[in-house]
Curated annotation (Swiss-Prot):
The protein's name: Glutamyl-tRNA(Gln) amidotransferase subunit A
Disulfide cysteine pairs (residue numbers): none
Organism, scientific name: Burkholderia pseudomallei (strain 668)
Gene that this sequence comes from: gatA
Subunit record text: Heterotrimer of A, B and C subunits.
Record SUPFAM superfamilies: Amidase signature (AS) enzymes
Recorded catalytic activity of this chain's protein: L-glutamyl-tRNA(Gln) + L-glutamine + ATP + H2O = L-glutaminyl-tRNA(Gln) + L-glutamate + ADP + phosphate + H(+)
Main enzyme class: ligase
Keyword hit for Ligase: yes
Protein's UniProt keywords contain Protein biosynthesis: yes
Length: 496
């Protein structure tokens, strides 16, 4: 059952092969049996089964949409009424939200059943899911490896068959990189496509929610429910609703050859994504995927994104600056952790934040406060914003000669748990191929395309697909065509 797609699971519900309650119970048992992965931080079977019973009633009355009765896990950065909403931090360890994030509310309105909240890097700051106050998540493909971050709990849950789908967020690669490391499909939509209301903020000009699942087709179904204008989010885009499944299974160009469904598609390959630093085994998997695309009729076109290397310093000025501002609200007074002993109000602020935040969050708050301080704002923050604009312009120049851009989602496969904990810069470098996409506000996704080599033979590789603004439906079409021709996305870790 856990290997079925969302469409297949819904067909099973419609055929009465199982009920929503039975489906939820199936996944709850799997979650309980896989506690060692540490993918979930909060599960409440009573709440889950109550939602499943409501879904069964809707299905019986013929009132259900295409997602009704299907289980989903939510990254613990989305506030969720009834479940704790911690953002992976001691600061919010016991926080109970009085409302649902828009993403949660929309998926619940579509009839989806919440299985629980998934583990994550604290306040979404990390690339390995080792920065969680609740301990690291293990990669189901190789439990000595990280699952990626910050949406590592979500990627591990989908890969291990603990949930058929999960929500994630992506600020600098936090959907795409863990999707790559765990061998699942994940998409970061265009900035503003998915509401940030109720999504605990890290960097407001970068944060974007998106779906994670086994396939592009499943992600398209989820995005149909998640995307759309929300007046409660000032950055939400006012655009007509779309059906993100509308191009799936169709030829790229009208009248195209069924044997060459992607004839006419131009794939841009940035030279900067295939240079020094890209592991040989990752390069081999990406090259093989590109050959599959050529066999499907696509044409490979060289392009250049010359400011790719600058995306790391630019991101690590802008994101910490915004985090410094956003996290100032956690002071121990209004909500969040409060120190047990303190002398006065200022001491309470200091101790509450010192005790509540982990090392990586403190590091980024300090960096952000520094770059926003008097005398440094112009030299760092404003300069970073200027280069950010140039990075976005570079993408637009590249898109003049191609329809989508492809390359690796990460320069390496997943590394061992603890391998980079003492060197944050090496951790930051792992996001070299995803950061610029976030800085430009473009949509990007990762699809499974193979595995590493040698000692890394059990560790997945993800192909990154980057589209122009609002091109999610076409990107999903391109990913879906690849997945119809390959089986990387349906492979499962041993023992699952």
């Amino acid at each position: 059952m856990h290997a079925k797609s969302l469409t297949e699971l819904r067909a099973a519900l419609d055929a009465k092969e199982c009920s929503a309650v039975e489906l939820a119970q199936h996944y709850l048992k799997r979650i309980d049996a896989a506690r060692d992965l540490n993918a979930f931080v909060h599960v409440d079977a009573e709440l889950t089964l109550a939602q499943a019973k409501a879904a069964d009633a809707a299905l019986a009355n013929g009132e259900a949409g295409p997602l009704a009765g299907l289980p989903i896990a939510h990254k613990d950065v989305f506030v969720t009424r009834g479940w704790r909403s911690t953002a992976g931090s001691k600061m919010l360890a016991n926080y109970a939200s009085p409302f649902d994030a828009t993403v949660v509310a929309r998926l619940s309105a579509a009839g989806m059943v919440t299985l629980g909240k998934t583990n994550m890097d604290e306040f979404a700051m990390g690339s390995s899911n080792e920065n969680s106050a609740f301990g690291p998540v293990k990669n189901p493909w190789d439990t000595s490896a990280v699952p990626g971050g910050s949406s590592g709990g979500s990627s591990a849950a989908v890969a291990a068959g603990l949930a058929p789908a999960a929500t994630g967020t992506d600020t600098g690669g936090s959907i795409r990189q863990p999707a790559s490391f765990a061998g699942v499909t994940g998409i970061k939509p265009t900035y503003g496509r998915v509401s940030r209301y109720g999504m605990i903020a890290f960097a407001s000009s970068l944060d974007q929610g998106g779906p994670m699942a086994r396939s592009a087709a499943d992600c398209a179904l989820l995005l149909n429910a998640m995307a759309g204008f929300d007046e409660r989010d000032s950055t939400s885009l006012e655009r007509a609703d779309e059906d993100y499944t509308r191009h799936l299974g169709k030829a790229w160009a009208a009248g195209g050859d069924a044997g060459k469904p992607l004839a006419g598609l131009r794939i841009g390959l940035p030279a900067e994504y295939f240079g020094a630093g890209l592991a040989d085994d990752v390069r081999a998997a990406i090259d093989a995927a590109l050959k599959t695309y050529e066999a499907l009729g696509a044409t490979l076109v060289p392009v250049s994104l010359p400011k790719t290397e600058l995306s790391i310093p630019v991101y690590y000025v802008i994101a910490p600056a915004e985090a410094s501002s956003n996290l100032s609200r956690f002071d121990g007074v209004r909500y969040g952790h409060r120190a047990a002993e303190y002398r006065d109000l200022l001491d309470m602020y200091k101790k509450s934040r010192a005790e509540g935040f982990g090392p990586e969050v403190k590091r980024r708050i300090l960096v952000g406060t520094y770059v926003l301080s008097h005398g440094y704002y112009d030299a760092y923050y404003l300069q970073a914003q200027k280069i950010r604009r140039i990075i976005a312009q570079d993408f637009q120049e590249a898109f003049k000669s191609c329809d989508v851009i492809m390359g690796p989602a990460s320069p390496t496969v997943a590394w061992d748990i603890g391998a980079k904990g003492d060197d944050p810069v090496q951790m930051y470098l792992a996001d070299i191929y995803t950061l610029s996409v976030s800085l430009a506000g473009l949509p990007g996704m990762s699809v499974p395309c193979g595995f590493g080599a040698g000692a890394n033979a059990k560790r997945p590789v993800g192909l990154q697909i980057i589209g122009n603004y609002f091109d999610e439906a076409r990107m999903l079409q391109v990913a879906d065509a690849f997945q119809r021709a390959t089986d990387w996305h349906v492979q499962e870790p041993a023992g699952v």
